[in-house]
Regions:
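Extracellular/virion structural assembly segments
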Residues: 1-218
């Protein structure tokens, strides 16, 4: 487990921002004008580390790894990677993933993510909830996860479903790539704000501020 993942797994709290970058202006007539300038909508995380760490060999190694990677190296992180925080990103549907489950369909475009049902999902009753708003879905091995914006039900006919996502497709996966959801999704990030460490009596150490992470979109 990476040092940054250790920080996330034991964090006091994590702030998540997915807001678009929006330009706002006021016209001479007093009208408020807005324009979204960012199609990719990168995820941003502010992570508050737990207050104190025992300054033992494991903690020193963790800190050294984080400082070595610094703010210029990409890291892959997971949310809900331990049992106590899995609820934060748990998959809410009743669909099946894996070899007989959802796979990527290259008809996907824009915010419409088209998925092949696979034999397991095709056998589910009509109307089964496959995805709920807020679910996170990703093509296995791809850099970018997507948030589902509306409930998706198993159709009565057909072999595909369309999932509307929070942002347009950034990269297209290979046809037939298996999909993952929930705690199996990952983010590639860079640290935009790296706190310093403070040594305390009793062989303790603390981080002096939050970690700020930004999704690395290329």
């Amino acid at each position: 487990m990476s040092g940054l993942q250790t920080i996330i797994n034991s964090a006091q709290d994590i702030d998540i921002s997915r807001a678009s970058m929006v330009a706002t202006s006021v016209s001479r007539s007093g009208r408020l004008l807005t324009a979204a300038r960012n199609w990719v909508k990168p995820w941003k995380f502010t992570v508050s580390a737990k207050p104190y760490w025992h300054y033992d060999s494991d903690t020193r190694a963790m800190i050294e790894e984080i400082l070595t990677l610094d703010r210029h190296t990409e890291k892959t992180i997971y949310l809900g990677a331990n049992a106590g925080s899995a609820w934060t990103i748990a998959y809410q549907g009743a669909g099946v993933f894996g070899a007989t489950g959802f796979t990527f369909n290259t008809a996907s475009a824009g915010t419409n993510l088209v998925l092949n049902l696979g034999t397991a999902n095709a056998a589910l009753p009509t109307g089964t909830v496959l995805f709920r708003a807020g679910d996170i879905v990703q093509a296995a091995g791809d850099r970018y996860p997507y948030a589902v914006t509306a409930t998706v039900l198993k159709p009565a006919t057909g072999t595909t479903v369309t999932v509307v996502t929070n942002r347009g497709l950034i990269t297209s996966a290979t046809a037939g790539t298996q999909m993952v959801a929930g705690v199996n999704c990952s983010w590639v990030v860079k640290v935009s704000k790296l706190p310093t460490t403070r040594l305390l009596p009793g062989r303790l150490v603390e981080f002096t501020s939050e970690f700020e992470l930004v999704e690395s979109v290329i």
